[in-house]
Amino acid sequence: MHLSLLVPFLFWITGCCTAEDPVTGPEEVSGQEQGSLTVQCRYTSGWKDYKKYWCQGVPQRSCKTLVETDASEQLVKKNRVSIRDNQRDFIFTVTMEDLRMSDAGIYWCGITKGGLDPMFKVTVNIGPAIQVPITVPTMPPITSTTTIFTVTTTVKETSMFPTLTSYYSDNGHGGGDSGGGEDGVGDGFLDLSVLLPVISAVLLLLLLVASLFAWRMVRRQKKAAGPPSEQAQSLEGDLCYADLSLKQPRTSPGSSWKKGSSMSSSGKDHQEEVEYVTMAPFPREEVSYAALTLAGLGQEPTYGNTGCPITHVPRTGLEEETTEYSSIRRPLPAAMP
């Protein structure tokens, strides 16, 4: 009878030992400071639709839950820890980023259910960050090369201006013999002493040509202006009109009454007449004087053209030596209506 009770008990013990655990994972994982680590926890197919979580600390029933899924395959992240459930392969993955030395300790992979949750213990180890030596590359020594150039100048006198022809040549490098370099420097100073006088002569010649050109331009402008006498001649063709009033010649006291009576009839008729004289104008407004002689008392007034300068009219024996003066001025132009 005791044996019949012992056999079922042994079968129960064997079944319990061979049964599969609800959740499993790595017992220990390691990471470096300022780095990251990943933990994969497996579960049986019967726990597919349950929530999975990652908690820290001991004992396991009072550990601190860091992150938990929502029974789906969506990624859930909280602070530096994230979790994702792959319900096709029955694996949920936990990732810890920016690791610190204080993150080392005991963690648990767990599944939420009513009562006691199936859990699996994982030990996390954190090592110090690896110091990577910084290598500063050294620059190779810099070697400089000095090149001396010689400029040869040839002056050709086949034209009005000298032609400068320059030849370029390389006499040597700094890496060569020092004696050759000194010869090149001496040739350069020699060519410079020849080149400077040539350039000065060219500049002097250009200055001389410019002065000659300016002198010719001034002379041409003076010729174009012309002498002032031509301008005076151009005014001689103008006509000037002047009003002349004739005065009676002086007579003796005895004959004054006779002449006055004889001229009373003819003098009144011609007193208001106007004398016109064609005069050549002068550039300046000057006063001209004309010597006029009067004929007999019975003669009509005489019209005459007087040119400048006015000459004296010859006198006859019958005429009296009386000279009349008149002021002739050029009239002003009439204003426009």
Curated annotation (Swiss-Prot):
Main subcellular location of this protein, as a coarse class: membrane
Biased composition (Low complexity): 252-266
Site (Phosphatase-binding) residue list: 241
Name of this chain's protein: CMRF35-like molecule 1
Species whose genome carries this gene: Mus musculus (Mouse)
Subunit composition and interactions: Interacts with PTPN6/SHP-1 in a tyrosine phosphorylation dependent manner. Interacts with IL4R.
One Pfam family here: V-set
Extracellular-side segments: 20-193
GO function terms (MF aspect): ceramide binding; interleukin-4 receptor binding; phosphatidylserine binding; virus receptor activity
Transmembrane spans: 194-214
Region (Disordered): 248-270, 318-337
Entry annotated with the keyword Coiled coil: no
Annotated S-S bridges: 41-109, 55-63
Domain Ig-like V-type: 20-125
One cellular component (GO) term of this entry: plasma membrane
Biological process annotations from GO: interleukin-13-mediated signaling pathway; negative regulation of apoptotic cell clearance; negative regulation of mast cell activation; negative regulation of MyD88-dependent toll-like receptor signaling pathway; osteoclast differentiation; positive regulation of apoptotic cell clearance; positive regulation of interleukin-4-mediated signaling pathway; TRIF-dependent toll-like receptor signaling pathway
Physiological role: Acts as an inhibitory receptor for myeloid cells and mast cells. Positively regulates the phagocytosis of apoptotic cells (efferocytosis) via phosphatidylserine (PS) recognition; recognizes and binds PS as a ligand which is expressed on the surface of apoptotic cells. Plays an important role in the maintenance of immune homeostasis, by promoting macrophage-mediated efferocytosis and by inhibiting dendritic cell-mediated efferocytosis. Negatively regulates Fc epsilon receptor-dependent mast cell activation and allergic responses via binding to ceramide which acts as a ligand.
Record InterPro entries: CD300_family_receptors, Ig-like_dom_sf, Ig-like_fold, Ig_sub, Ig_V-set
Keywords: Cell membrane, Disulfide bond, Host cell receptor for virus entry, Immunity, Immunoglobulin domain, Lipid-binding, Membrane, Phosphoprotein, Receptor, Signal, Transmembrane, Transmembrane helix
Signal sequence, start to end: 1-19
